[in-house]
């Protein structure tokens, strides 16, 4: 299986193309491996993440993602399953961007698990090329296409990733511009979107019911069990809402806090005031999905205005989001980050 091969080779020594330079926040290094269709990202010679662009994945993802201290914040399943993980939602891989209703097609839920007879209901994001690597600015620029199951291109996607590290904080900015390639491309409100992160077990909320997980040998348990060992994630948003109640609420930022193996880690997801329908609706779930959706509308909040965006051929729409990974971050620290993100010129 091609995607499994990509992961197995992930930690091997790379004899591949690399670019590095001193950035404002540290030395960013990109190592591109064209054979295995990936770009590894390092800061100060310490691993950060990998951009995976195999078209077997139905979309491009950043996976896995590590803290400064070397702890993985992403779920391993389905590419690299770990003991005691959940195996739900195989389309949740690392950090990604897509949506649940584009001209009636579901891009969000597509994965290798979808049966061939149902594939016509789903869309895929196909990689085209790496446009540019600029290590001095921590930038990776990519080109992709949103297509239907027959290969018809609905949207052209130009994405810029900006990777940085400062004072123990790692960040990923994603700026995605979508251009219509059809007479009309319609985004209809849907809860499944828009930028998503599937987190490690430590960041989940403790479960109240027995469930099936992978055992120590990587096999699914025969009998449901209640296992909350090491599980202690807590969400909070800019308005002070906590826990599972953040879901469906509009907020300019949502933070997820947990203790993983004795280290306090906070993951923060930021919306940008230039985005449509700012601030975005939270699509954060206790089982480990951490997402922010600018196009959710009534799909998550019946009192919200309806959301429907139509792009004529050649028209564009741009989304800007940021992920910050740090220690025990206070609300005031996060507010300052949000303000800086909104002030930054793109």
Predicted regions and their residues:
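Positively charged n-region of N-terminal signal peptides that target proteins for export
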Residues: 1-6
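Bacterial N-terminal signal peptides
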Residues: 7-18
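Beta-strand-rich N-terminal accessory domains
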Residues: 22-90, 175, 330, 335
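Acidic (Asp/Glu-rich), glycine- and aromatic
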Residues: 51-57, 61-64, 166-214, 225
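Extended, loop-rich substrate-binding clefts of extracytoplasmic carbohydrate-active enzymes
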Residues: 93-168
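Beta-strand elements of well-folded, non-transmembrane domains
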Residues: 144-148, 161-165, 178-182, 199-203, ...
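Active-site/ligand-binding surface loops and adjacent short beta/alpha elements
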Residues: 191-276
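Beta-strand-rich recognition/accessory modules
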Residues: 267-346
């Amino acid at each position: 299986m091609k995607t499994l091969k990509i992961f197995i080779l992930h930690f091997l020594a790379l004899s591949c193309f690399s670019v590095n330079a001193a950035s404002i926040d540290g030395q960013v290094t990109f190592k591109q491996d064209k054979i295995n269709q990936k770009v590894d990202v390092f800061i100060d010679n310490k691993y950060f993440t990998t951009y995976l662009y195999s078209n077997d994945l139905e979309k491009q993802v950043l996976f896995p993602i590590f803290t400064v201290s070397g702890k993985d914040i992403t779920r391993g399943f389905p590419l690299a399953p770990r003991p005691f993980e959940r195996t739900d939602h195989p389309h949740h891989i690392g950090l990604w961007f897509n949506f649940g209703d584009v001209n009636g097609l579901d891009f969000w839920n597509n994965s290798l698990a979808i049966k061939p007879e149902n594939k016509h209901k789903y869309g895929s994001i196909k990689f085209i090329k790496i446009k540019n690597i600029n290590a001095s600015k921590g930038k990776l620029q990519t080109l992709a296409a949103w297509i239907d199951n027959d290969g018809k291109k609905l949207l052209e996607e130009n994405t810029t990733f900006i990777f940085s590290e400062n004072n123990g904080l790692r960040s990923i900015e994603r700026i995605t511009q979508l251009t219509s390639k059809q007479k009309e491309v319609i985004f209809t409100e849907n809860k499944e979107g828009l930028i998503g992160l599937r987190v490690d077990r430590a960041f989940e909320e403790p479960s109240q019911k027995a469930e099936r997980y992978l055992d120590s040998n990587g096999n699914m348990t025969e009998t449901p069990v209640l296992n909350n060992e090491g599980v202690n994630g807590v969400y909070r948003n800019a308005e002070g809402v906590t826990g599972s109640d953040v879901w469906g609420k509009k907020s300019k930022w949502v933070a997820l806090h947990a203790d993983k193996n004795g280290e306090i880690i906070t993951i923060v997801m930021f919306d940008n005031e230039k985005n449509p329908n700012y601030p975005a609706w939270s699509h954060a779930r206790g089982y480990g999905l951490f997402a922010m959706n600018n196009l959710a509308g009534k799909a998550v909040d019946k009192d919200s205005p309806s959301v429907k965006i139509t792009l004529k051929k050649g028209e564009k729409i741009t989304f800007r989001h940021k992920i910050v990974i740090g220690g025990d971050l206070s609300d005031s620290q996060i507010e300052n980050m949000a303000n800086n993100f909104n002030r930054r010129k793109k």
